[in-house]
Each structure stands twice: as structure tokens, then as C-alpha cells.
A protein has these predicted regions:
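Glycine-/small-residue-rich active-site loops that bind phosphorylated ligands and cofactors
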Residues: 5, 28, 55
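C-terminal binding/interaction regions
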Residues: 31-106
Length: 106
């Protein structure tokens, strides 16, 4: 559930379904901090999983992680996706290590 100016919105589905609800605070006023704080401060009994501001990708990955608990094929796809993410980080670090500067940086 994306939440910008109506950051209290995730409580509606969270209060009326036993299914997990993921709140995504969207950057609006106060750099999204108002939305983030509104989502993480849900009342007792109305849990909402919350990701970072503008964290729709992480919300999607979290949803797939939940769904993959009962689906081996989906779990395999998620594992491969995460391996790809790890490879991108390793590759980026290797490229960054090759950058040389003519002046001292530390």
C-alpha cells in the first residue's frame, strides 16, 4: 500500500484482513518522514510491515519472500534474483576498486 499524504491508509486493509499488509511511505512533505512515522506507529493489533521511503522495490521483494514460503518454484526464482543482485554489487565494487586518482584521497 503506497502511502504519501494519506500515510494512515495502510490501517484500512490491515484492520480488515488477516493477510499481511506492506506499507510503502512515499516522499511528499517532510521528505517522507511523516508518512514513514505514520505507518510504523500503527495501533496494537493492526500490524503493517513497513519498508523505506519510496521502497516499492523492497516491498515487492518482501511480498515475494512471503509468497515463496508456500511455493518452491517462486522460492527458486527469488533465490536466483538475489544471486543476481549480489553479483551486481560485487561487479560494482570491482569497478570502483579500479578507479585511480592522481591525488591522495585519504
Amino acid at each position: 500500500t503506497p502511502a504519501g499524504k494519506a500515510a494512515h491508509f495502510p490501517w484500512l486493509p490491515a484492520a480488515s484482513t488477516p493477510l499481511p499488509v506492506i506499507g510503502v511511505p512515499i516522499n511528499s512533505t517532510l521528505d517522507g518522514m511523516d508518512a514513514l512515522l505514520a505507518i510504523v506507529q500503527m495501533p496494537p493489533g493492526i500490524p503493517v510491515a513497513t519498508v523505506g521511503i519510496n521502497g516499492a522495490l523492497n516491498a515487492a521483494i518482501l511480498a515475494v519472500q512471503m509468497l515463496s514460503l508456500g511455493d518452491e518454484q517462486l522460492a527458486g526464482k527469488l533465490k536466483n534474483y538475489k544471486k543476481g543482485l549480489a553479483k551486481k554489487i560485487v561487479d560494482a565494487n570491482e569497478k570502483l576498486a579500479q578507479v585511480k586518482y592522481a591525488f591522495k584521497t585519504n
